[in-house]
C-alpha cells in the first residue's frame, strides 16, 4: 500500500474522496505546506481556477512541490474537479503531471462516486505493484 498525499479545500471533497481509499494519508497543511515526505507518493489535488484557468493549482500544493525532496518522490497525480468548469475540469492535475513528468492516473468529480472509488483502489494497487 502506497502513500497518498492530498490537499483539500473547505468543501472537503478531496478529503472525503481519499478517506474512502484505504490508503495511508498525508495531508498538505495550508499553514505548513513545506513539510517533507520521505517515500514515493501519489498526489490527490482539487482544481482552483478562475474563468480563464489561471491559478488552478492551490498555492499550498505549489509550495509543497517546490521542495526538491517532495518533487523527487511524486509518482503520479489524481485530480478532483467540477465538470461545470468545462475545459478547466481537473486542470490542476494536468498541470502537475506535465510539470513533474508523472502520469495523471485518474480524475473524479466533486466527491467522486462509488465507481470512482473502486476504480482508483484497483488502479492504485496495480500502480504500486508496477513500481516495486
Curated annotation (Swiss-Prot):
GO molecular function: FMN binding
One GO biological process term: protein modification process
Pfam families linked to this entry: Flavodoxin_NdrI (PF07972)
SUPFAM superfamilies per UniProt: Flavoproteins
Family annotation (Gene3D superfamilies): 3.40.50.360
Stated family: Belongs to the NrdI family.
Function per UniProt: Probably involved in ribonucleotide reductase function.
Name of the protein this chain belongs to: Protein NrdI
Native source species: Bartonella henselae (strain ATCC 49882 / DSM 28221 / CCUG 30454 / Houston 1)
Underlying gene: nrdI
